[in-house]
Swiss-Prot record:
Gene3D superfamilies: 1.10.286.20, DNA helicase RuvA subunit, C-terminal domain, Elongation factor Ts, dimerisation domain
Organism: Polaromonas sp. (strain JS666 / ATCC BAA-500)
Its job: Associates with the EF-Tu.GDP complex and induces the exchange of GDP to GTP. It remains bound to the aminoacyl-tRNA.EF-Tu.GTP complex up to the GTP hydrolysis stage on the ribosome.
Alphabetized PANTHER family for the sequence: ELONGATION FACTOR TS, ELONGATION FACTOR TS, MITOCHONDRIAL
Localization per record: Cytoplasm
Alphabetized CDD domains for the sequence: UBA_EF-Ts
Name of the protein this chain belongs to: Elongation factor Ts
């Protein structure tokens, strides 16, 4: 069967796999899209298994608001293929809606919420287990945050980044802040709010760099900076870092001639807090070796 450019484009849109891989998979599958998707899963899984240091995880960020209450949730799965699955997307949407309506105490409590979907139910946990069997991949609700009592502005960058801003003032300005947070990923509102462990880590890095520079200067017979100058360099590096990672001090993405704080003041808006979710942030995805897995299965079958 002749493989057309439109077929390749369609498979790429569904899987996000490289164009050449899509063409090869369609050729091997003789134009059968379902079979081509399975071929891609095997090929890409094998490649991913070789990337032992790869840090990532797949999933979707969903947001729902109703009656002044909002919910941001991250639901994880094993591969990028499933993030485009209609049933999985419907599940994430339903969970976000359920969090708004039911106000669960924690992630475990989400499983007990009422839900019927795709013939599975009557709880979220029942639907989750049913979809695992149907789709063939594990999935889990990783984290969520429910918002109530404040004006809310949100921004979703596809399904991989989600931001919610609690604010007073101009809604358009707050939405601009949400988009800015998604792009610049600050860790706190102000420099004073940056977590102590991050500050300590940055100070340690700056001190190590200063020590390295001193050793290099000494080895080359050049003057070594005094302890006082070194201390000022370290403090300067830390202060620069604090400005770079705090929302108020960052240059506003839509106008780099002013800081976010200046923009907010100009538009009479106050940001109370922001919440940023990035899919897979902080999760190390297991690097599976597909060939080794197959070999293990064959060995197990022979031993049986």
């Amino acid at each position: 069967m002749a493989i057309t450019a439109s077929m390749v484009a369609e498979l790429r849109a569904k899987t996000d796999a490289p164009m050449m891989e899509c063409k090869k998979a369609l050729t091997e599958a003789d134009g059968n899209f379902e079979k081509a998707e399975e071929i891609l899963r095997v090929k890409l899984g094998n490649k991913a298994g070789k990337a032992a240091s790869r840090v990532t995880a797949e999933g979707v960020i969903a947001y729902h608001s109703e009656g002044g209450i909002g919910a941001l949730v991250e639901i994880n799965c094993e591969t990028d293929f499933v993030t485009k699955n209609d049933s999985f997307l419907a599940f994430t949407k339903a969970v976000a809606e359920g969090i708004v309506k039911n106000n669960p105490a924690d992630v475990d409590a989400i499983g007990a919420m009422a839900l019927s979907l795709d013939g599975f139910g009557p709880t979220v946990e029942d639907v989750r287990k049913g979809l695992i069997g149907k789709i063939g991949e594990n999935m889990s609700v990783r984290r969520f945050k429910r918002f109530a009592g404040s004006k809310l502005a949100s921004y979703l960058h596809g399904t991989r980044i989600g931001v919610v801003v609690e604010f007073d003032g101009d809604e358009t300005a707050a939405k601009d802040v949400a988009m800015h947070v998604a792009a610049m990923k600050p860790v706190s509102l102000s420099s004073a709010d940056v977590p102590a462990d991050l500050v300590a880590k940055e100070r340690s890095v700056a001190a190590a760099k200063a020590a390295e520079d001193a050793a290099k200067a000494q080895a080359e017979g050049k003057p070594v900076q005094s302890a006082e100058i070194v201390a000022k360099r370290i403090d300067g590096g830390v202060q620069k870092y604090l400005k770079e990672v705090s929302l108020y001090n960052q240059s506003f993405v839509k106008n780099d001639k002013q800081t976010v704080e200046q923009m907010l003041k100009e538009r009479a808006t106050t940001v109370k807090s922001f919440t940023l979710y990035v899919v897979g942030e902080g999760i190390e995805k297991k690097a599976d070796d597909f060939a080794a897995e197959v070999a293990a299965q064959i060995a197990a079958a022979k031993a049986a």
